Every structure is written in structure tokens, then in C-alpha cells.
Amino acid sequence: MSARKILILNGHPGQTSLSKSLCAAYQAAAEENGHQMRCHDISQMQFDMDYGQGGYENPKPLEPDLAQFLEDLEWAEHVVMAAPLWWGAVPAKLKAVFDRALLPGRAFDTRNVSFMGLPAPMLTGKTARVLLTSDTPALWLRLFYGNAVKKFISRQILGFVGIKPTRFSTFAPATDAPEAKVKTWLAAAGGLGAKAA
């Protein structure tokens, strides 16, 4: 496999987390296999989370961390995002990254609208992998919640701007997981990184 350009986004706002460890395992294996990496960690990113009232007509200027994230997103061929499932969705700060950074003219084109009324995506030709940690078992997420968070991420965020397909790896239940189980999860993340999958 030829080297790929990979963007990793750790979407857990804590300084230490399973999400961060999964990102590190993925990154280490990807680098060992010659893939190019750019990494962002929302616990280190500084920006105003409030989208504000300006809308797309008068958006807030992107802070340096968001501007760099968007530049790296445009550069990447493959996007890896790790995040915990909190109250059925991703953490607010991670959602704010997309609220603020995915702007018209860079992520989607409102001047070019489909017959369904949707703007043309501008980040096409990219794929994604989401490393989702949760205390809700994967079967429960699918049968009782209809994989709502997966649809939200893959269709309403990444797919909307052209990043597809998005594949998911779910690690659950995460809280108080035995050390041996965590090791298997980290190995799985490393296996994905080695293949840039």
C-alpha cells in the first residue's frame, strides 16, 4: 500500500482518555508503515466554541487552531477521529470544531446546489475511520438507538462535506474495562493504523 496522508483528531476533551490512547496506537503504527500524519487534540485546541449569531454571512474568524485543523483536513486523504459517546452524541467541544471550521467555500459550496437542495460537498475523495468509545454495548446502540450517533457523524457531518465512506470501530463498555481488554483495543487500533484503514 502506498503512503497515505492521515489526519487524526482526538475528540476527547480530557487530558488523558482511552480515546487519546487509541489515537496514539493508531498513529504509532501508521508512522511505522510510512504514512504521513497530522494530529489534533481538542484538549489542546483553543477556540471559542460558540458559533454565535453571525451565521455564514458574517462568520467569526477562525482561531489559529481551527484554521490549522481545516487546512489539515483539506490536506488529508484519510481522517481518523476518536471520541467518547456522551448522552448519545460526541462531546460539545468536538461538535464545536465542526460547527466553526466546516465553512461554506471550504467544506461545501452553497452556489452549487443539487436538485434536492443540498450544497455541493468540497472535501470529496477522502475516507474516514471513527474510533468510538462507549459504555453502551454496540448491539444496544444498533438495536435500540438505531446507531443514531453513527448516522449523525457519517451522514450529517462527514458525508455532508464529501468524506465517505466512514467506518466505525466501537470499543465498549469502556469504563472500568479490564486492562487485558484495553490492550486488545489498542492492538486493534494499531492494526487499523498499520493499514491506514
Q: What does each model-found stretch correspond to?
A:
Residues 42-61, 180-182:
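N-terminal beta-loop-helix "entrance" segment that forms/cooperates
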Residues 21-24, 52-55, 94-97, 143-146, ...:
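Short, glycine/charged-enriched secondary-structure capping and boundary segments
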Residues 140-197:
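Glycine-rich phosphate/pyrophosphate-binding loop and the adjoining helix
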